[in-house]
Structures are given as structure tokens and as C-alpha cells.
Amino acid sequence: MNKIIIRKLFIFDVIEKKAKSVDFEDGINIVTSKGNQLGKSTIMKSIYYTLGAEVFFADRLNVKSKIHMLETDVNDKKYTFIRHGDVVVIKDGKGIFKTSNASELSSKLHDIFGFSVFLEDKQKKYVIAPPVFRYIPYYIDQDHGWTSELKSFDKLGQFDKKSRDLLFYYHLNILDEDYGVKLKEKKELDASMTDLKTRKKEILGLLAYIRENITAFNLEMDITALQIQKREILNKYKKYSYDLNNIRRKILEYQEEIFKIDNVIDNLNSTLKQNDKVREHIKHQFDVECPYCNNHFEIQAKDILRINYNIVDLEASKLEMLDIKEKLLGKMKKVQKEYEDYQATLKAIEEEKVDSENTLEDILKFKGLQETQNQLNTELVKNTGDIEEKSEDLKEIRRDLKKWQDEIDKVNSRYKDILNLNLIRFNTNEHALPEKYNIGKNLKASGSGQVRVNLARVYSFIKLLEEYNPTGLKYPLVIDSPKGGEQSTTNSELILRLLTEKAQISNQIILATIDFESFYNGDTKKFNIISLENEPYHLLSAEDYQNNQVIIDDFVSLYFEANQ
């Protein structure tokens, strides 16, 4: 049979040298004690925790100092799971696997269990779900599992409730990895179709606007004749525009020459000022004392003449530059006048009319509208083709999704029938379910009735699994404190009887309850009774550690070997 059987659980603390070992059997296992706080819940939480789930351990356990180990059979193959913190080690006949990554562990568990769940995370990506989503239908936690939401595991917030509820249909073998792929493709196609339809609406609006404007032109335009006239006007425009550019360049050349001349004149003026100062100084001081030898000498007349000559020469050059500048300004004035005339001519050409009331600007606008219309029509053809193609793709995807949805609706209806029956069997008052009720939908009850409602929900799903996926993997059903919530004696006896002798399911069952034998009157020999007799808060003991020293050392060695 395709099932997982928990054979042995070890919890040990290598620092305090304490341990707890528990042997389980295929069939029904009862973890019980006479009092509370002896460690029943710690044992129950440890089972799926060791398999990679996150659970609500009490702080006093100090799980960081503990190593958990499970010996399991999966389809008659032996697997050993070891967990410390986030690290999970798996040993089988082929070797050792180690990881601290939930996705890697999920992929490994797929190889072992032959089954995975794929869900959409909050980033809208379909991913292989963490290991816990394999175990949710099979575990009820004492502290968190008896509410209407059935939230027995920790750290489920990566996925919203709607996405999480899909996990049940993976267990039923209705959904698979392709479902997530198809949903993703549908969302992408829907977004693409929205964009295409928006663009199509824009194109049609633009084309309507263009048609209105072109119609106004068409009433008076012979396009062929206008095209000829337009070409003539354009040629004339190009010629004058070319000549105007040449004139503009000539003006720039004159302006550049004048700028250079102004620079030369400025330099001449500066030099003349300096020579004037020297000449004035010499005029009043012919007797000069040498600053080095203190001798007196007279300035030669030829030096005075040379200075005077330079000044005269510079002034002549300045006059020559001014004359050249004046001539250039005259030429530039003529060219500027020519430039203004050409500008006026171009403006007249721009406003020149053909054999209609439309100007060249109107014709150019008309031509532009025609070209835009052609481009938009081309785009519209492609847009329409893309919409048709994507519509066909969407139809195919919707057909596939509808098949899945039809199966989901069908199985929801069957689950509702089974649940209605079991709500009665578990003696609840919540019999009137909504017309449409899916497997993951919360069902609220008052007081102790919530416990019985939750048991009915979990039990109904397992019965549904046997109908819809009889060859699917059967996980251990782990239920902590099923007669909690201040159940009456009658209801407590009913619950234990329904979960044991009348269970009629092939999954391994592990129940934890206080004082089991006081509430069960049947034959207990067919059950594996695990009685806890330790002191409160002392589940682990030095004696258990010593009795299993060799096994514990082997596990510790195996764990550290995997972490090398």
C-alpha cells in the first residue's frame, strides 16, 4: 500500500545528555498519560516537524538545543529523517541528503513521496510549496488546531488563504503542476488582451478622427492635380530655402570678419595708449640715472624718433582697419536686405494656394493624415490578428481550467455530502452547510462543538481521499487532544470510538489524549498504547539517553557527516 508509516521518534539533547524515544506501529497508536504537561504534545508536534514542517513548540522546550529523528517506511522503503534547527538530513539506501532550504527539501520529498503541491505566492509566482503543505490535512494541533480555521502549523503566511485552500485538490490528484502553469498563462494572456483591446480602441478612435478630417479635404481636392501642384510649390520652396541658407552663411562670414577686425582695432588702441605714456615720460626726462651704476646719460634722439614712428604707424594701421570694417558693414547690409527679401518670398510660398482654398500647410497636413491612416490600418490588422490568436489560446486554456474546476466542484459537492454525514456521526449541531461549500472553507461552531466539527472535517477529507485517490500516498493522521474543549464524557467516548475502532481508514493513526483508558471501554490490545509516566516538563531523561547511547551517537555522526 502507498503509505507512510512512522516507526520511531527520537528527541535528544546532546548538551544535557537527555533523550526520549517513542516506538510507533502501523495502525492505531495512542499517546496517553494520567496528567497534563508530561510531553504528549511535544511528541505529536515533533512528528511533522522532523519531516520539515514548522510547528508551535513551547518556548520551554528550547528546540534549538534538540535534535529530532524519525525512522519511517515509505512504500516499504526505509528513510531516516534528522532535523536540527532549519537543517534537515535524509538518509536512505542510496545515500545522504542535507538542506536548510524549504524548496530544496520539497523537491527531495517529491522524489520520495511522488507528490507535490504548487501554489501562488504573494509575488504572484507559482512555486513548489514548502513541505508543510503535504501535511496540513493530517495534523490537528492541541493549541492551534481546534479553531474554525484549522491552523495547526506555523509560518503559512507566504500564501494567502485562497491559495492555500487549493492544496486539498493536489492531495486528491485533481490538480498538478500544469494547473499553476495554465493559471499563470491565463493571467498573462488576460493582461495582454486588455492591452491589445485598449490599443485597438485607441486606433479606431484615431482612424475616426482622421476620416472626418480627410473627408473635409476630399470635398474640394483632386489629389492627383494637387500632388503635381504641391511638388511644384515644394521645388520652388526648396530652391529659395537653399538660396536663403547660402545668404545666411555669407552674413555669418561677414560677421566673423568684422569681429576679427574689431579685435585688431582693440589691440591697436591698447598699444597706442602704452606708447603715448612712454612718449610723455621721455619728453620730461632726457637725463636718466642708471639704477645699477648710478651714472647719468641722455636719451638719444633716434630713440625718441623710433617711438614716434611706431605711434604713427599704428595709427595708420588702425585707420586702415576701420576703413575695411566700414566696407564690410556696407556689404553685410546689402546681404541682410537680400536675406529679408528671401524670407518674405519663402513665407509667400508657404502660404501659396493651389486650385482650392487649401494652403501648402493644408496639403502637407492632408498627406500626413493619409500616411498616419495607412500606418494605423496596418497596425489595426496586426492588432486584430493578435487578439484572434490570443483569444484562441485563451479558449484552450479556459477549457483546461474548466475541466479542473468541474472536477473541483464535483469533489466539493461530494465532500459536502460526506461532511454532512460525519457532522451527525460526531454529534454536532452544525448540519446545515451552505449550498456551495469547498473543502478548505472554515466552519465555525460554539464551545466544545468546534472540536467535533474539526474532527468531522479532517475525517471527511480522508474518506474523500480514499474515494478519489485510492492509490495516493496515505500520510499518518496525527491528532492531539481530540476530546479537548470540555467535552462531556459521552462525547469523549464517542470521539475516541469513532477515531479508533470505527475509523475505517487505512492511514496510520497517532492520537494523544489524557487518560485514554478511562474513556475507552473497548479492547485496547489492538492499539499501540504509549503511556507517559515521567514528571511534568521532563519528557526527556538521562536514562533514555543512556539506553540509546549507541543509536544516538550514530545519528549525531550521521548528522555531522552530512554537514561536512
From Swiss-Prot:
UniProt-listed InterPro entries:
P-loop_NTPase
Source organism, top-level taxon: Bacteria
Q: Which GO terms describe its biological process?
A: defense response to virus
Which key words tag this protein in UniProt?
A: Antiviral defense
| Function of the protein | Component of antiviral defense system Lamassu type II, composed of LmuA and LmuB. Expression of Lamassu type II in B.subtilis (strain BEST7003) confers resistance to phage SpBeta. May be an ATPase.
Q: What is this protein called?
A: Lamassu protein LmuB
Tell me what organism the protein belongs to. Answer: Bacillus cereus (strain VD014)
| Name of encoding gene | lmuB
